[in-house]
A protein has these predicted regions:
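Alpha-helix capping/helix-boundary segments
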Residues: 8, 36, 78, 104, ...
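Residues that scaffold the ATP/ADP-binding catalytic core of kinase and kinase-like folds
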Residues: 11-12, 40-43, 82, 126, ...
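Acidic, PIN/NYN-like endoribonuclease modules and their adjacent C-terminal/linker elements
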Residues: 1, 105, 111-137
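Short, well-structured N-terminal submotif of metal-dependent ribonuclease cores
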Residues: 1-36, 44-63
Length: 137
C-alpha cells in the first residue's frame, strides 16, 4: 500500500497514464489523505455551479474516482505529526508553504507508507517520509 498525493490522483483522472495505473492496481489498494479528497472536491466546487447537471456529473465522476482508494482521516496523530513537521522545518529554516502537503506527509508518516507524488521537492525535505517520484514510477 502507498499513499498517493493529490498530484498523482489528478494525473490518474486526466488519463494517459495507463501503465502507471496498471502498476498501482497490481500492488493492491492505496490510500488517500482526507486532504486530497478536500482538494479534489474544491475543484468540483470552483468549476461548477451546484444544482447543475455539470456539477452532478463532476460529483459522480469524483465519487467513482475516490471509490478506488481507501481514505484516511485527519486524525489527532496526523495533526500532531503535522505540527512536528512544521516545527522541525521552521527550526531548520526550510519551511514548507503548502500546508496540504504537510498533512499528506504526516499521514504517510503515521501510517508508515511511502508517498507517491509528482511534487517530489515538497516532500523530500520531510524526515521519515519515503518519497516515490510519480514521473519515474
Amino acid at each position: 500500500m502507498k499513499l498517493l498525493d493529490t498530484s498523482v490522483v489528478v494525473d490518474i483522472d486526466r488519463g494517459g497514464v495507463d501503465d502507471k495505473v496498471a502498476t498501482l492496481d497490481e500492488q493492491g489498494r492505496h490510500l488517500l489523505s482526507m486532504v486530497t479528497v478536500t482538494e479534489l472536491q474544491l475543484v468540483v466546487e470552483l468549476q461548477h455551479d451546484p444544482g447543475t447537471d455539470a456539477y452532478r456529473e463532476a460529483q459522480d465522476k469524483l465519487t467513482r474516482l475516490l471509490s478506488r482508494f481507501d481514505i484516511h482521516p485527519v486524525s489527532r496523530p496526523v495533526a500532531t505529526t503535522a505540527a512536528r513537521i512544521i516545527g522541525s522545518l521552521k527550526q531548520q529554516g526550510r519551511p514548507l508553504d503548502d500546508l496540504h502537503d504537510v498533512y499528506i506527509a504526516a499521514t504517510a508518516r503515521t501510517q508508515q507508507l511511502p508517498v507517491v507524488t509528482a511534487n517530489v521537492d515538497h516532500f523530500e525535505r520531510i524526515d521519515d517520509v519515503d518519497v516515490i517520484d510519480w514521473e519515474t514510477f
